[in-house]
């Protein structure tokens, strides 16, 4: 089974993305910016006869007064990956315009914990006002921000993960769902990266070597 880890700031839509991938309302969602996931939760999804374990994680960049302080969320990600028998894909989830904090979050998972051994996707949420979600990535100013912060995903998925009060976004939601599931199937690592192959002390060194 392939492990897929979704990470990002609190309130960016990770849990809604999980529900979209799994095709069931398995993860609790919140309309607030503080996030609703306090610890990692795993859910199974089947994509074209392949089974994936999708990990919803606590939101990063919360203050000490937040549901999960940033330092605790960081350590939770480390402990999650350390206990897995392999990691096949990382998904950086972000709502709209990328902020400076994204650089640290990206570096945390991609470099400090996984040592650039795991492919990484970017999924941009909160695009309900776009005529076509893909238009967001076509704008040079958005691509420029990714380059500025040195975010280099294998692919970018611009989506709508909210059906709407009266299912007004149902059509674009369905297209977004198919898009994300396809990106996972195409870009995941066939031979999962095994964190156990790296000494435990090396993990801690990477985690705190900012």
Show the residue positions of the predicted features.
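Conserved GTPase G-domain substructure that encodes guanine base recognition and part of the catalytic core
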Residues: 1-210
């Amino acid at each position: 089974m392939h492990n897929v880890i979704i990470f990002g700031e609190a309130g960016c839509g990770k849990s809604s993305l999980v529900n979209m991938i799994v095709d069931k309302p398995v993860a609790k969602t919140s309309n607030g910016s503080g996030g609703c996931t306090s610890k990692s939760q795993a859910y199974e999804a089947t994509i074209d006869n392949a089974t994936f374990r999708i990990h919803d994680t606590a939101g990063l960049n919360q203050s000490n007064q937040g549901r999960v302080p940033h330092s605790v969320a960081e350590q939770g990600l480390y402990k999650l990956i350390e206990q897995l028998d392999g990691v096949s894909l990382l998904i950086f989830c972000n709502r709209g315009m990328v902020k400076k904090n994204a650089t640290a979050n990206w570096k945390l998972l991609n470099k400090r914990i996984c040592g650039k051994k795991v492919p990484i996707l970017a999924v941009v949420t909160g695009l309900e006002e776009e005529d076509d979600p893909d238009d967001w990535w076509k704008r040079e100013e958005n691509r420029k921000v990714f380059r500025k912060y040195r975010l280099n995903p294998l692919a970018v998925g611009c989506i709508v993960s909210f059906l709407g009060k009266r299912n007004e976004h149902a059509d674009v939601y369905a297209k977004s769902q198919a898009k994300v599931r396809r990106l996972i199937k195409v870009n995941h690592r066939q031979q999962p990266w095994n964190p156990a192959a790296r000494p435990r002390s090396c993990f801690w060194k990477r985690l705190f070597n900012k």
